[in-house]
Amino acid sequence: MTNYRSGRINEEMKREISNIIRNDMKDPRLSAMVSVTKVDVTKDQKYAKVFVSIYGEDKSKDDTFQVLKSSESFIRREVGHRVKLRNTPEIIIEMDNTIEYGMHINELLHKIKENEKHDNE
């Protein structure tokens, strides 16, 4: 039963944090596209790790990540207003590179396939 509840909390926070980043943050340095990929709330609901993927050039990725890190308290306050929890967890934003890693692996597999194709000819 608690796994079901924690899963619902994670998904609700993910949805609300995505909306906050997309609609409520007005910082001009937030130029890259940001996607919240996962939220992990601890069992005691004191902390929430928010994993984000940022698409864009390296400079804009770094700027966007710094804006998000400095906005953790703003995001926490907004989540507290929108999600009904006894205590609002402290937000910890972390970079999620799994999509980029997956694209890299896909590219390597494609190169291997091309090499095998040329070797067979």
From Swiss-Prot:
Keywords: Cytoplasm, Ribosome biogenesis
Listed transmembrane segments: none
One GO location term (cellular component): cytosol
GO BP annotations, alphabetical order: maturation of SSU-rRNA
Subcellular localization, as worded in the UniProt entry: Cytoplasm
One Gene Ontology MF term: ribosomal small subunit binding
Main location: cytoplasm
Protein family per UniProt: Belongs to the RbfA family.
Subunit-structure text: Monomer. Binds 30S ribosomal subunits, but not 50S ribosomal subunits or 70S ribosomes.
Physiological role: One of several proteins that assist in the late maturation steps of the functional core of the 30S ribosomal subunit. Associates with free 30S ribosomal subunits (but not with 30S subunits that are part of 70S ribosomes or polysomes). Required for efficient processing of 16S rRNA. May interact with the 5'-terminal helix region of 16S rRNA.
Protein name as it appears in the record: Ribosome-binding factor A
Source organism per UniProt: Clostridium kluyveri (strain ATCC 8527 / DSM 555 / NBRC 12016 / NCIMB 10680 / K1)
Gene of this entry: rbfA
